[in-house]
Regions:
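N-terminal secretory signal peptides that target proteins for export/translocation
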Residues: 1-3
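Divalent-metal-activated hydrolytic enzyme cores
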Residues: 6-56, 75-92, 99-104, 108, ...
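Short Gly/aromatic-enriched secondary-structure transition segments
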Residues: 57-64
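A generic structural signal for alpha->beta connector loops
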Residues: 65-68, 155-157
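A short beta-strand-loop structural module common to alpha/beta enzyme folds
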Residues: 67-77
Length: 171
């Protein structure tokens, strides 16, 4: 039987596939170990704004949370939780916190707001609020969020952060 390039390609694919599948099937390899972990450090609540995704990941990696937190998003983050126009947002967030406690044994809730937040302009009906006005509203909402979560989930630590438009964390 003559040798074909296809035989070599199939053999190579088989070897590569088996080298990936066998360790997973026999409880070896990093993937199996990672999938068996049942804990996470925290649930992180942040805004839905796509502009800050990479900056948030970089920040959480830098403080030791790489691949070690549950992610939850609400428009406005702390404001999304505190506002009254959509009360189901708060209840949904609370249910996710409860679930993260049960599934992943979290011991912390972290909320990260960001400056230049469209949800703040819309929910406060203030399209031209100043940077200082927005900053003060963030601080107010972050503090209110912390108080409310501490009351509802006293066993959890609550940490608040505010990201600036350049990706730096202000607090």
């Amino acid at each position: 039987m003559p040798f074909h390039k296809n035989h070599l390609m199939y053999a190579l694919l088989l070897v590569i596939s088996l080298s990936i599948i066998i360790p997973v099937l026999f409880n070896g390899g990093a993937l199996r170990d990672r999938l068996s972990e049942k804990t996470a450090k925290a649930l992180v609540l942040s805004c839905i704004d796509f502009r800050f995704v990479n900056d948030k990941v970089s920040f959480f990696n830098s403080i030791g949370f790489r691949d070690d937190y549950n992610k939850f998003s609400l428009a406005g983050a702390s404001l999304g939780y505190n506002q009254t126009q959509f009360p189901e947002w708060r209840e949904t967030c609370n249910k996710h916190i409860e679930l993260a406690m049960q599934l992943h044994d979290i011991n912390e809730v972290i909320v990260m707001d960001h400056m230049d937040c469209g949800a703040y302009r819309i929910l406060y009906d203030s399209p031209s609020m100043s940077r200082q006005e927005e900053y003060e509203l963030h601080k107010k909402n972050l503090n209110k969020f912390k108080t409310m979560i501490n009351q509802k989930f006293p066993a959890l630590t609550v940490t608040t952060h505010l990201m600036d438009v350049d990706g730096s964390v202000m607090s």
